């Protein structure tokens, strides 16, 4: 075993209900094995690494690290920084003109005496970590980078289950359980529940499934109008499945006529190509982030779907609600805590072996929990619409299954 002298932890990208739990789990595991190993946490993700801004993990922090399990978010802070996007790093004042952000980051790790870097983030964070690991190896820095995969989308190849996704689905279901009662406030109400998921419908589908489990456990009073039908999910739209707007409008109008409301779950990535084409045709700029991704909050797919359907189904009022920030900023649930603990424990074990990679259940190797090689990590894993539970749900809510759509990342 090659004992690390100093370990650094950073979180990056958007939030997911696992970050604090993962930070706490890593600190606790290192402390259990050898409390003499120094730990620092870079403030604000890769931004903190570039600027040399970090928190020391003191004895008091080690003692109370378990407190982090109770809170959502990331106490050490996140940022969206791509080390290979030199222009953006210069523009944001993170490096000087002419500097290579990867070299600045590597030199800062050396300056801080770090020999193990733990990155906790999604596909962008871990591809950035992969680039940094390759740079370190090419230039003989002798540092090990170990990633933990967080994303509410559950869309990272070849990882079976990303950290935080189960919790996000559960929290999105809880969110809509309150919102859905708004159908009492107005006749012929259309409620659109927009769920996070850039190019992957897993979270939308899983949120709908978790929500329907809540309905399964509920008690109803149809004699006074409290029916499951009015609380039901009437349609689920994901990027990987084609949508026949006219046919769906006809079906949903029948639901509206019968139940007096329609509840739609839609992925924020569904219909984006059509929306972007519409924006470009009008000469409008399509906003993008540092990684080149379309800023979905500016594109507003839920609003677009609401506008498409409202007139066709005869809605008197349309309500569009987004559960994304509510869900992603939650503390981890029990299932995720268990997954996070097992991944963090293996990450520490890999640190002692100086084994780089992203910790996860490898779908290409029998779903074994291991350090997956960085070059094999990539985003954009689509949701499999042929999954049994998804097909059963579509059948139960009376929604015809659309054809498969190839989604781009």
UniProtKB/Swiss-Prot annotation:
Cofactor(s) the protein needs: Mg(2+)
One GO CC annotation: cytoplasm
Any one GO BP annotation for this protein: fructose 6-phosphate metabolic process
Active-site residues, record numbering mapped to chain: 153
Marked site: Important for catalytic activity: 150
Pathway entry: Carbohydrate degradation; glycolysis; D-glyceraldehyde 3-phosphate and glycerone phosphate from D-glucose: step 3/4
Enzyme Commission number(s) of this protein: 2.7.1.90
Entry binding sites for diphosphate: 14
Pfam (any one): PFK
Binding site for substrate: 151-153, 196-198, 268, 325-328
Family: Belongs to the phosphofructokinase type A (PFKA) family. PPi-dependent PFK group II subfamily. Clade 'P' sub-subfamily.
NCBIfam families registered for this protein in UniProt: PRK06555.1
Family matches, as HAMAP family: Phosphofructokinase_II_P
PANTHER family given in the database record: ATP-DEPENDENT 6-PHOSPHOFRUCTOKINASE 1
Name of the molecule in the record: Pyrophosphate--fructose 6-phosphate 1-phosphotransferase
The species this protein was found in: Methylomonas methanica
């Amino acid at each position: 075993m090659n004992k690390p002298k100093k370990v650094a932890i950073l979180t990056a990208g958007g939030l997911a209900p696992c970050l604090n739990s993962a930070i706490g789990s890593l600190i606790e595991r290192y402390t259990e094995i050898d409390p003499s190993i120094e730990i620092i946490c870079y403030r604000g993700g890769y931004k903190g690494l570039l600027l040399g801004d970090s928190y020391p993990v003191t004895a008091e922090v080690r003692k109370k690290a378990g407190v982090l399990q109770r809170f959502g978010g990331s106490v050490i802070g996140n940022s969206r920084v791509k080390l290979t996007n030199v222009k953006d790093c210069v523009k944001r004042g993170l490096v000087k003109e002419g500097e290579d952000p990867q070299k600045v980051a590597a030199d800062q790790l050396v300056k801080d005496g770090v020999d193990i870097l733990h990155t906790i983030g999604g596909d962008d964070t871990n591809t950035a970590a992969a680039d940094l690991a390759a740079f370190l190896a090419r230039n003989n820095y002798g540092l090990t980078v170990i990633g933990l995969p967080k994303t509410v989308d559950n869309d990272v190849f070849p990882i079976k289950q990303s950290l935080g996704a189960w919790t996000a689905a559960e929290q999105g279901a809880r969110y809509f359980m309150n919102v859905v009662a708004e159908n009492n406030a107005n006749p012929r109400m259309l409620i659109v529940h927009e769920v996070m998921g850039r190019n992957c419908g897993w979270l939308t589908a899983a949120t709908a499934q978790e929500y329907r489990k809540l309905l399964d456990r509920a008690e109803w009073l149809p004699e006074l109008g409290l029916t499951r039908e009015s609380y039901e999910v009437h349609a689920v739209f994901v990027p990987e499945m084609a949508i026949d707007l006219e046919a769906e409008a006809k079906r949903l109008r029948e639901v509206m006529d019968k139940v007096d409301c329609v509840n739609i779950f839609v992925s924020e990535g569904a219909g984006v190509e059509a929306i972007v084409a519409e924006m470009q045709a009008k000469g409008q700029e399509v906003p993008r982030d540092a990684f080149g991704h379309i800023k979905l909050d500016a594109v507003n797919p839920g609003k677009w779907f609401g506008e498409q359907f409202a007139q066709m189904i005869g809605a008197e009022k349309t309500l569009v609600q987004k559960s994304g920030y509510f869900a992603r900023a939650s503390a981890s649930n029990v299932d995720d805590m268990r997954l996070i603990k097992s991944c963090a424990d293996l990450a520490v074990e890999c640190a002692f072996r100086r084994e780089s990679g992203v910790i996860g259940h490898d779908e290409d190797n029998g779903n074994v929990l291991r350090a997956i090689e960085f070059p094999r990590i990539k985003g954009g894993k689509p949701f499999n619409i042929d999954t049994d539970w998804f097909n059963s749900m579509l059948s139960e809510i009376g929604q015809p299954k659309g054809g498969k759509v190839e989604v781009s990342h």
